[in-house]
Amino acid sequence: MPLSKFGKRHKKTFGKKKEKWDGNFRIPPKPNSYYVQEKGICRWCGKKIIENKVHNKRKTWHQDCATDYMIIYHSGEARKHIWKRDKGKCNECGERCTRRGWDLDHVKPLMEQKGIKGNKLDWSYYELHNMQTLCRPCHKKKTKQDMKNNA
């Protein structure tokens, strides 16, 4: 199927990609480059990859760094980890949630990070210890409270 210059699909595929970080505080900035000058250097932290006391020149990610990256930039991965950790129970009311009837909540709300860029960004907001399982009603209540507190 050809892509029409004026179609939605064409715009989705080739349209101008805007920086998500400017107005959207939910996604932190990505590293400048995913490519490394030398194999065996982690793309995320920039340190050498050492396995069994030997510099592994075939890999480009530390396992922990790859997991952190996936949790931060792919919400499905974070949801999977939190669901397993909390065993599907709401941290507020203790009720068992259905697979689709729950929300991943940030204990320290991400709205506190709005507008913060560069080195001042607090990465702990995007780590697993700051995430919890909440059923939809509890998540609604907590979000409302967070909005009041940060207004």
What kind of region is each of these model predictions?
Residues G40-I49, S75-K108, C135-P137:
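Short cysteine-rich loop/turn motifs with clustered Cys
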Residues F14, L110, T143:
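Alpha-helical and His/Cys-centered functional microenvironments
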Residues Q37, W83, M147:
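A short, flexible N-terminal coil/short beta segment enriched in small residues
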Residues A66, M70, E95-T98, L128-A151:
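Short Cys/His-centered divalent metal-binding micro-motifs
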Residues E95-T133:
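Histidine-centered nuclease catalytic patch
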Residues R26-Y34, N56-E92, K120-Y125, H129:
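Short, charged surface segments at domain edges that flank catalytic/cofactor-binding sites
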Residues K53, G101-L104, D146-N149:
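Generic domain-boundary/flexible-linker signal
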Residues P2-R26, S33-M70:
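BZIP DNA-binding basic region
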